Structure formats: structure tokens, C-alpha cells
Amino acid sequence: MVMMKKLLSNRLFNMSKTASQSLMNCRTSSSSSLAMRTRVPKDIGEATIDPEPGDLTISQRFLNKFSMNGIDTTSKMSIGESLMEKLKEMDMNKDRIRLDGLSHPKEETLGLTVQDVKKLLRAAEIEVIKTKLMETGKIWIRYSDFLGVCSDSSLDPSQGALIAKMLDDSGNVIVMGNSVCLRPHQLTKSIEGLLPLSQIHNPNDPRRKELNELEAIKTVIDQKAHSLVRRELWAGLGYLIIQTAGFMRLTFWDLTWDVMEPICFYVSSVYFMAGYTFFLKTSREPSFQGFYQSRFEAKQRKLMQSEDFDVGRYDELKKLFNPKPSGAVPKILGSLQN
């Protein structure tokens, strides 16, 4: 019996020692404070019974494990709920068009590039310069004056020589030495008569024979018209002679000068009005030469109509085989010599 009591007391002592060590090694201060409160009685007279050390340790471990499991479960639940919400949002938004993620299509700009703007400005400058050159009313000007117009009308005066060269290369003007032709079309028409063409000088060309026939017919018509006009002129001269003789008779024999003076004045006024009317109708000087040309053309037209003469065909063939240079040719030759 004594031995059994000693063994029992040793086991209890070892158990209490182990419990105290576990209490000292506990990580939470709350458990240690709780153990101290259970071991220390509130009142001195109150008897307390110490709990079993093993039971306290087991309960503390269970509480710690429960608290950790609760925290893990809560965190797992929160993570799972957030994941489910994300999945639901993705499922709800899978059929929706995300406008914020779409990029706007590139609009096709129809604007002008820098090169296009430069071309338009250069074309506008050239048109302004051409207008100013035409406003001068001249056919030929000096190259220095031409260069001055190009420089003054350009946005950049230093580009005047370049614009002048562009006008010359494009054929808008023709630069010949120190002279510039502002109307190249007139120059080309004038030089056409100076350029020999092999086709024109072909003696077997049937058009040349046709021209010769028309010229023969026209020569006959011109002779007839000339003779008719000459008759009219002789008749006019005879009329003036008779009128002058009649006025002399009335002035010196039948009537007096006082009577014939106003009559001669009014007759002269009638002749003046007739000459003025002739000028208005024909735009020619009221002279004998002008009257002759007017009457000759009138008679010539009548005879051509009566002979069925093709004036258009005759003018075309004459221009082709016998071109006449215009009056600008001497000016051109003079400018080339200078």
C-alpha cells in the first residue's frame, strides 16, 4: 500500500510538472492569464480546486485549433464568394459588347498634303503673273521687265527667276535673248508662212490644180467687178460736172448769187451727211478710195453668187498653198537681230 501511494504521488507530480511546462510554453497570453485566474481564488476563504493540467491543455489546443479553422474557413469562404462573383460577372458580360475596348476606326482623311498645297500655291502664283502680263497689252517686253513682274507677283521674290523659267518651259511665253513674247500663238501664226512644207510644194497635188481653176474664175469675176465700179465712178464724175455747170448757169445768168448761195450751202451739207452715213455703214474713210473698195466688194459678192463660186474653199486652198505672213514678222525678225 505504501509503495502504491508513492507511485501514484510520483505520477501526479510528473503530470503537474508537465502541465506547468506546457503552460509556460503557450504562445497566447490569454490562456496563461486564464490559468492564473483559475489557480488563484477570488477570496481567501474560498476553497478552490485546481483543474487537471491535461484538461486545460487539451481545451486550449482545441480552442486554438477551432479559432484557426474558423479564420481559415472564413477566408476560404470570402475568397470563394469573390471568385464566384467574378465568374458570374464574366458569364453575364460575355454576350455584351465592350465599347470601351473597341478602337475607333481610322477615318479616311481627304485633306491636302503639304506637297499638294505647295502645288496649288505655285499654280495660283503663275496665274496671277500671266494675268498681269496680259494686262500690259504688249506683245514683246524686255526680259528685265518680265523678271520684275515675276518677282513682284511671287510670294517669295527670290523665286522670280524660277517662275520665269517655268513660264518659258511651259510655253506660256517665249524668251528670245533680251526679249520676251507674251503671246506665243501670234508668233507661231506669223512664222507659219516662213516654214516650207514638202506637201505644199508637191506639183502633182490635185488641190493645187483646184486652186488654179478657182483663181482663174476669180480673176474673171474681179475684172467684171472692177469694170462695173469704174463705170459708176465715171458716172459720178459726169454727175458732178453737170451739177457744177448748172449751178454756174443759175448763178450768173438765170438767178443771182444771193439766191444760189444758200442753195449751194444746203447741197454741200447733203454731201457731208452722205459721206458720214457711208462711214457709219462701212467703217471706212469717206474718200474716193474708200468708196471704190466698198463698191468693188459689193459687185464682187454679187458676181460670185451668180457664178456659184465657193469662197470658203478658195480661201482654204489659198491659205494652204500661198500663206501670207502677218505684219508681225518684221517685228519678230528685228527682235531676233537685236
From Swiss-Prot:
- The entry's protein name is Calcium uniporter protein 4, mitochondrial
* Keyword vocabulary terms for this entry: Calcium, Calcium channel, Calcium transport, Ion channel, Ion transport, Membrane, Metal-binding, Mitochondrion, Mitochondrion inner membrane, Transit peptide, Transmembrane, Transmembrane helix, Transport
Q: What does this protein do?
A: Mitochondrial inner membrane calcium uniporter that mediates calcium uptake into mitochondria. Constitutes a pore-forming and calcium-conducting subunit. Mitochondrial calcium homeostasis plays key roles in cellular physiology and regulates cell bioenergetics, cytoplasmic calcium signals and activation of cell death pathways.
Does this entry carry the keyword NAD? no
Task: State the Gene Ontology BP annotations.
Answer: mitochondrial calcium ion homeostasis
Ranges that cross the membrane: 233-253, 263-280
Please name the Pfam families in this protein's record.
MCU (PF04678)
Which PANTHER family does the protein's record reference?
A: CALCIUM UNIPORTER PROTEIN 1, MITOCHONDRIAL, CALCIUM UNIPORTER PROTEIN, MITOCHONDRIAL
Binding of Ca(2+): at which residues?
261
Q: Name one GO molecular function term.
A: calcium channel activity
GO CC terms: mitochondrial inner membrane; mitochondrion
- The chain's transit peptide is found over 1-36
| Reaction catalysed by this enzyme | Ca(2+)(in) = Ca(2+)(out)
Domain of life per record: Eukaryota
UniProt record similarity statement: Belongs to the MCU (TC 1.A.77) family.
